[in-house]
Curated annotation (Swiss-Prot):
<keyword id="KW-0540">Nuclease</keyword>
<keyword id="KW-0862">Zinc</keyword>
<dbReference type="GO" id="GO:0008833">
    <property type="term" value="F:deoxyribonuclease IV (phage-T4-induced) activity"/>
</dbReference>
<dbReference type="GO" id="GO:0003906">
    <property type="term" value="F:DNA-(apurinic or apyrimidinic site) endonuclease activity"/>
</dbReference>
<keyword id="KW-0479">Metal-binding</keyword>
<feature type="binding site">
    <location>
        <position position="143"/>
    </location>
    <ligand>
        <name>Zn(2+) 1</name>
    </ligand>
</feature>
<keyword id="KW-0255">Endonuclease</keyword>
<protein>
    <recommendedName>
        <fullName>Probable endonuclease 4</fullName>
        <ecNumber>3.1.21.2</ecNumber>
    </recommendedName>
</protein>
<keyword id="KW-0234">DNA repair</keyword>
<keyword id="KW-0227">DNA damage</keyword>
<feature type="binding site">
    <location>
        <position position="176"/>
    </location>
    <ligand>
        <name>Zn(2+) 2</name>
    </ligand>
</feature>
<keyword id="KW-0378">Hydrolase</keyword>
<dbReference type="GO" id="GO:0008270">
    <property type="term" value="F:zinc ion binding"/>
</dbReference>
<comment type="function">
    <text>Endonuclease IV plays a role in DNA repair. It cleaves phosphodiester bonds at apurinic or apyrimidinic (AP) sites, generating a 3'-hydroxyl group and a 5'-terminal sugar phosphate.</text>
</comment>
<dbReference type="InterPro" id="IPR018246">
    <property type="entry name" value="AP_endonuc_F2_Zn_BS"/>
</dbReference>
<dbReference type="GO" id="GO:0003677">
    <property type="term" value="F:DNA binding"/>
</dbReference>
<feature type="binding site">
    <location>
        <position position="66"/>
    </location>
    <ligand>
        <name>Zn(2+) 1</name>
    </ligand>
</feature>
Length: 282
């Protein structure tokens, strides 16, 4: 059964995320542990941590933490790469300790180096992470990217290269619909969607996809820019989300919207997804 939710703010306290999710009718939710554009994190005090654990147990459905945007595990700058590994480790440990289901990250950006070198750096960084800490509960999700500015993980061949190194580690994929479409996957036609599924199955296996970031795209197919739009209002359109939500496998996953936040649109976007999912006439 598909579950629908959104990215919510953790401003003030991570405990506030549950109420913010409830207020928009979210069955699942995602949040940042720290400002996505800051390295510093004051951490979580013992009382807040315990309260969060209890709330999470009551919530039951999958909660996702998104890694900060500053992280770049692919960076040729050793100081930046090591800093990224440190933050990744810090957040992954916390997620695993409190029972967060998913820790999601962008593989990284190959700035000034080849994609191959960048992928080697990502693998090196993850080796450093997992040699120090192996999650027992939390699944680490690699998010596909739009391929903008050297972003890695833009296709499932690249994701496979990373994931194949870490057999036995709780790894999976978070499919971002906007990123996939902007890269060039034609998920809004029947034929394009079937080709897309075949590539996933061939490269990483459908079962590797554990969650979906449901976002329409402000850029056309292959536009290679990460620009999210409201569901049904962009170039993917309702057909793309219908392909996903009527599919035997993708209709079983949790969906997290990261659509523009203006005018309290989260409940509207969630209702559009639910209507597609529940209406057999569509």
């Amino acid at each position: 059964m598909a579950l629908f939710g959104a990215h919510v703010s953790s401003a003030g306290s991570i405990l506030k995320t549950f109420k913010r999710a409830k207020d928009i009718g979210a069955e699942v939710f995602q949040f940042f542990l720290r400002s996505p554009r800051a390295w510093y994190w004051k951490g979580v005090d013992k009382e807040t941590k315990q309260a969060f654990i209890e709330k999470l147990k009551d919530f039951k459905n999958p909660v996702m933490v998104h890694a900060p945007y500053l992280l770049n595990l692919a960076s040729p700058n050793e100081e930046l790469r090591e800093k990224s590994v440190k933050v990744f480790l810090e957040e992954l440990k916390f997620c695993d300790e409190v029972g967060i289901h998913f820790y999601n990250f962008h593989p990284g950006t190959a700035k000034g180096i080849s994609d191959e070198e960048g992928l080697r750096n990502v693998i090196k960084s993850l080796e450093e992470v997992f040699s120090e800490y192996t999650p027992k509960f939390t699944t680490v999700l690699l998010e596909n990217t739009a391929g903008e500015r050297g972003d890695l993980g833009k296709n499932f061949k690249e994701l496979k290269e990373i994931m194949n190194v870490f057999r036995g580690i709780k790894l999976g994929v978070c499919l971002d619909t906007c990123h996939a479409f902007a890269y060039g996957y034609e998920i809004n036609t029947k034929e394009g969607f079937e080709n897309f599924k075949r590539e996933i199955e061939k490269m990483v296996g459908l079962e590797s996809v554990k969650a979906v970031h449901a976002n329409d795209s402000k850029v056309p197919l292959g536009g290679r820019k990460d620009r999210h739009e409201h569901i049904g209002k962009g170039y993917i359109g309702l057909e793309g989300f219908k392909n996903l939500l009527k599919d035997e496998y993708f209709s079983t996953l949790p969906y997290y919207i990261e659509t523009p936040k203006e005018n309290n649109m989260d409940p509207v976007n969630l209702s559009v997804l639910r209507e597609i999912y529940q209406n057999n006439d569509l």
